Amino acid sequence: MFKSLCFSAALLLFWGRVAAADDASRPYPPPAEVRAKLLAQLDRPRVPLDPQVTLVEPGEAGLIVERLTIASERKADGQIERVPILIVRPKETGTPRPLVIFLHGTGGNKESQVHWLVRVARLGMIGLAIDARYHGQRAGGATGAAAYVDAITAAWRVKPGQPQEHPFYFDTVWDLWRVLDYVGQRPDVDPRRVAMVGFSMGGIQTWLAAAVDQRVAVAVPAISVQSFRWSLDHDRWQGRANTISGAHRAAAEDLGEPEVNQRVCRVLWNKVIPGILDDFDCPSMLRLFADRPLLIVSGELDPNCPLEGARIAFAAAEQAYKEAGASDRLQIDVAEGVAHHVTGKQEKLIADWLVRWLQTPEKTPPEKGQ
């Protein structure tokens, strides 16, 4: 009986890998074409960065805390969208240092990343966090994800021909490119040693923003690697939809559906994050990282990022890194029995990954801009 169960489990694992490999081989456009398409999709006129520093003060253990904002874009109503930034850095200046950007999840804010900013600053790096669109200081006084859900609902209801925002990931991706413009101007930052680490929503923003921007030398998308297409096709969309359930319920009502279902998700996602079910899905985007150091951190039981879909993305990344002769620069860690959570062991893995790949500058400078 025991041998039979073991054989069955092994067979299921084998066929799961075969299915992932088959889906990973799904023909996506070449990486350069995907990169160009995403840049074009999100493009908008740049405005001067206009950094405005609001605070520089001593922090714990001889560290320095900075708070500032930068300009990201001029919106359709003429208002300048500004990105709030929190930085923790070593007190000593002189030799340019590595910098790590940390991104929070849905309903969070930059303050939730302070422990990471302090951790990397103690390692001699500069830590930076931002508030995503409609989060933190950008939520208009709302708490959690309320303003974010309202913004996505409003974006869903925009009529054809009217200005269309993309608060569901894409607009924050643009902000991150502007943050990279800013850090590239700081004399205390080594532009060859910039990393991006994101959790949940922030992880998705990481594999979108950093995939197409070579200025990000090292990336860690945590509890975020998945396949949106697989989740929808296999009726496993619920975890992702529930992170912004109010927007999905509004879309269901507008579409005349009694409840949120696959059709609602498909129509909503195609409008507010166009391309996420096709060329901009995670299995396609991870190919663009090769051969930069990429650490993927996932949970075996994560309902937001079903493992079966995540394996498709894993396989796509493994193939791309193999073809680039850089398999040693890709690491995938799946925590057994863990849902949508980063374990203490995985946190140490992230810190060690940053130290490993940011200690020594690369010889080739990054491309300017995206």
Describe the role of every protein-language-model region.
Residues 41-95:
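N-terminal cap/lid segment of alpha/beta-hydrolase-fold proteins
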Residues 88-89, 97-105, 298:
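The conserved beta1-alpha1 loop
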Residues 95, 147-200, 216:
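Gly/Ser-rich "nucleophile elbow"/oxyanion-hole loop immediately N-terminal to the catalytic nucleophile
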Residues 101, 106-174, 228-235:
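Cap/lid segment of the alpha/beta-hydrolase catalytic domain
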Residues 177-246, 275-277:
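Primarily recognizes the serine-hydrolase "nucleophile elbow" in alpha/beta-hydrolase
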Residues 218-285, 306, 310-314, 320-327:
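Mobile cap/lid helix-loop segments that gate and shape the active-site cleft of serine hydrolases
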Residues 251, 314-369:
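C-terminal catalytic histidine-bearing segment of alpha/beta-hydrolase fold enzymes
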Residues 289, 296-298:
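Short beta-strand/loop motif that positions the catalytic acidic residue
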